[in-house]
Amino acid sequence: MSEMTPREIVHELDAHIIGQKKAKRSVAVALRNRWRRMQLDVDFRQEVTPKNILMIGPTGVGKTEIARRLAKLANAPFIKVEATKFTEVGYVGKEVEQIIRDLTDIAIKLTREQQMGKCRQLAEEHAEERILDALLPKPKNDWESTDTDTGSNTRQIFRKKLREGQLDDKEIDIDVAQPQIGIEIMSPPGMEEMTNQLQSLFKNMGQAPAKRRKMKIKEAFKLLIEEEAAKLVNQEDLKEQAIEMVEQHGIVFLDEIDKICKRGETSGPDVSREGVQRDLLPLVEGCTVTTKHGMVKTDHILFIASGAFQMAKPSDLIPELQGRLPIRVELDALSADDFKRILTEPHASLTEQYVALMGTEGVKVEFTESGIESIAKAAWQVNERTENIGARRLHTVMEKLMEDISYEASDKSGSAFVIDADYVSAHLDNLVQDEDLSRFIL
């Protein structure tokens, strides 16, 4: 679990996302509160529930990007899902409890990696012995055996060469475990336990024996380390730790929640909107979900919901769900100045990406201050005149601007291009000023 302070989290987010201070501060505090809660006494800790967040803002201003970056910082089970992918229980489609099952699978993978990391040194030793056994087979009969000291010395010589990388390209025959065959079974609601038992049965039936393969020692060493580390991991402890991690540190990011708001009066069941909201209620409030790894309680899982709310309002969510998302954060629409900062300030910004890509062809591209200002202004104008899609408009504008250079780069190695205001004007002015062209091309 991340022990970063709110200030450190915001600083990390600033490296990738421009503006949106309120949203960054809210998610930073929420993430830090996960750590603070774990410092409390066990009895008191159970009473402290997470304050779920609702992020409201137009498309392309950074809501989803905040989620992506937060996932890397959290060092905890994190899942991002689209609310529109789910339907009400009893209808064809994914039910919302699948969110927790997927989150548990992520936690299992995360915990396995952590445990395998702890026993990696021992796994390397075991893998080394298996490679030495392949290089120096043990004698089958007593009369084939040589002097014990000589055999031991030879093994040590080969061990030294192996560690120094002198044998990396030598080929050996080793027995490698075959990957297990996974079978996905769709189950009706309430039948998850039976489905899990069937999957376990098929898994055991489909477990293939180890296969002898010829490969280079360098590749074999990596495979054997993974195999030996997997043997050292206790599967029951792994499941217990993973479920504990989900229950105490799990984070669910619900994107596009505005798309499941009920709009106007409709007849018949609304299985992918209001029905989904009702199914989300017990998850957000706290319930127990059956997974193939065990029972998972959702009482202390943090939920962060986000939506553009262009066709609906937060008040269109059912009241019970509104009450379970107490922290509201409004993200600001992006200005021309924000676009300018997006083009230059973030790590691996758009301009840096194009410079690096063209550099692979031996073409030098330089973006001037005036050129960047013109690109930002053009993107902002198109957003104002047509649909406002936020920072995503920059991708379209930049691709159109760089189209000729990208096409001809492979034939112009050693050339240099300066992207200034005049260049931008020559390539984009017609498209920006003509609303019909802007609508269909940019």
From Swiss-Prot:
**PANTHER family (alphabetical):** ATP-DEPENDENT CLP PROTEASE ATP-BINDING SUBUNIT CLPX-LIKE, MITOCHONDRIAL-RELATED, ATP-DEPENDENT PROTEASE ATPASE SUBUNIT HSLU
HAMAP family of this UniProt entry?
A: HslU (MF_00249)
Assigned keywords, A-Z:
ATP-binding, Chaperone, Cytoplasm, Nucleotide-binding, Stress response
Q: Which cysteines are joined by disulfide bonds?
A: none
Q: Which gene encodes it?
A: hslU
The residues that hold ATP are I18, G60, V61, G62, K63, T64, E65, D255, E320, R392
By what name is this protein known? ATP-dependent protease ATPase subunit HslU
Q: What does this protein do?
A: ATPase subunit of a proteasome-like degradation complex; this subunit has chaperone activity. The binding of ATP and its subsequent hydrolysis by HslU are essential for unfolding of protein substrates subsequently hydrolyzed by HslV. HslU recognizes the N-terminal part of its protein substrates and unfolds these before they are guided to HslV for hydrolysis.
Q: What organism does the record attribute this protein to?
A: Shewanella putrefaciens (strain CN-32 / ATCC BAA-453)
